[in-house]
Amino acid sequence: MSIRERLGFANPHLLTASTAAVNALGGKDTFLAVHVRLSDGPFRALREQTVRSVWYRLVACAMRGVNASAGSADIYELERLLVPTNAVLPPPRVPLVQSVPLAALRPPEASMAGERRIKCAGKQHVAPELVPLNVPLFVATDVEDGLALAPLRAAFPCTILLRDLSDVPEIRTLERLVSAEDGVPLGPFLAPLLDAAIMGRAWAVVGTEGSTFSTYVEGLLWRLEHGHQIAQRG
């Protein structure tokens, strides 16, 4: 086993909490996941472009699960419908499905089932062409304000952040952990790891270009969780 293949999570507290969170979302491979980094440096300057880029890639994943031929033109029309403030913009030049193996481009088997323990805040789509977007979307982000994430919520009515899972008992337990050495609360340090562990068990995952966290989740953790080969670098 290579060093990269050993970079998954083994901490029992983290595994217990992430498994409970995944189950609350409906189970492994029943939800999409995205990492949206927006708050600092170049990411702050490019926040609108970043949200639009991941929006296109997420919608492509959801739509191609039921229609493999869905392309940029189809998704652009959906954007004009769901995010009218972007209607004057040309389609972004981004790969629609990047770093997601073709095997992942299938409908999640239980995404609409009643197994989810978390309540979706948005109103579910009823139009047939939009129903695939009812799939739960887990969002890991450093900016949780409604305006920044509004395009995602408009497309995915079941958009869920880590804070929305705070009632899951195992997550509350993780948040209460303290260091045995100095009594420092560990919750804030474990939250990004919990985000990553949840994302790794999504049906498909999309990240922010240039983010090392996104690269780790997309290129290593998600692939480990799904039994795909990990590309060796350097």
Q: Residue spans of the language-model regions?
A:
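Core catalytic architecture of nucleotide-activated donor-dependent transferases building glycoconjugates
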Residues: 1-176, 180
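A donor-sugar binding/catalytic signature common to diverse glycosyltransferases
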Residues: 190-234
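Long, positively charged, glycine-interspersed low-complexity recognition regions
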Residues: 153, 166-189, 193-209
